[in-house]
Amino acid sequence: MKFVLLFGVLLVTLFSYSSAEMLDDFDQADEDELLSLIEKEEARKDCIPKHHECTSNKHGCCRGHLFKYKCQCTTVVTQSGEGTERCFCGTPPHHKAAELVVGFGKKIFG
């Protein structure tokens, strides 16, 4: 009887140790996931929203619903005849078409 009791205590101890190791692994995975989410959130805060100027940072546009906005540039001619480049973050026409098709597909198929 003492042997069974000793074996049971040993088994419970090993089980609690192994479950503690597994919980530590899960906690580490949760921390890694949280850090990556925080980094993505910081990157989002630094991005340039839609319709805002991106002349100085052409690769810093935010993400839209499906695609990242693209920096679209035009040349603006002033009354004095000088041409300056002005850029803004926007959705290119082919991305608009793809978003329209996806939205239409979601309405039809659910």
UniProtKB/Swiss-Prot annotation:
Residues 21-44 form a propeptide. Residues 1-20 form the signal peptide. Belongs to the neurotoxin 19 (CSTX) family. 03 subfamily. This is U1-lycotoxin-Ls1ll. GO terms for molecular function: toxin activity. It holds the Pfam family Toxin_35. The keyword Disulfide bond applies. It comes from Lycosa singoriensis (Wolf spider). It is found in: Secreted. PROSITE patterns: SPIDER_CSTX.
